[in-house]
Amino acid sequence: MERAAKKEAVEALNEVFKTTGVAVVAHYSGLTVAQMQKLRMQMKQAGASVKVSKNRLAKIALEGTDVVAIGSLLKGPTVIATSNDPVAAPKVAVEFAKTNESFVILGGSMGKTVLNVDSVKALASLPSLDELRGKLVGLLVAPATKIAQLSTAPAAKLARVVQAYASKSEAA
């Protein structure tokens, strides 16, 4: 790799690390190309991304970012999964590790907080931001729905009484 290409790679990685909400580091030794493509696809669908680069270049790119602490995890063949959503990358990484023994999570970072393997797994078990937003909207809409049901209930009861009276009159 030429010096200019290395500089470009470091700058690109640095931008990714500056804007990311969470980063997960894992060993991927022994994964097939098809498995790596599957991982990349799953990450992309979840709104996350996967980066494989030389550890030395990644350590340089980490300087001046919040996730600089993961530099100590970059030993051997490592992959770095990043996402803005604090749950997306850990969730996909943990699920992928369950089905692929060659994919071993080493740890990660959420902002300036260093995460060990258990912390990454705990983060993966949380609901995503979209799920939380859906629950919040449901909670906000529920009272309005109940009020609408209560306001239409008397009219519905009156209509049923009139219908019953009309049915009774026809039968007589």
From Swiss-Prot:
Ribosomal protein recorded as keyword: yes
Highest taxon above the source species: Bacteria
UniProt cross-references to Pfam families, sorted A to Z: Ribosomal_L10 (PF00466)
Database matches in CDD domains: Ribosomal_L10
GO BP: translation
This protein's record includes keyword S-adenosyl-L-methionine: no
Keywords, in A-Z order: Ribonucleoprotein, Ribosomal protein, RNA-binding, rRNA-binding
GO cellular component terms attached to this protein's record: large ribosomal subunit
A GO molecular function held by the record: large ribosomal subunit rRNA binding
Assembly mode: Part of the ribosomal stalk of the 50S ribosomal subunit. The N-terminus interacts with L11 and the large rRNA to form the base of the stalk. The C-terminus forms an elongated spine to which L12 dimers bind in a sequential fashion forming a multimeric L10(L12)X complex.
Function: Forms part of the ribosomal stalk, playing a central role in the interaction of the ribosome with GTP-bound translation factors.
Annotated family: Belongs to the universal ribosomal protein uL10 family.
PANTHER family: 39S RIBOSOMAL PROTEIN L10, MITOCHONDRIAL (PTHR11560)
Entry protein name: Large ribosomal subunit protein uL10
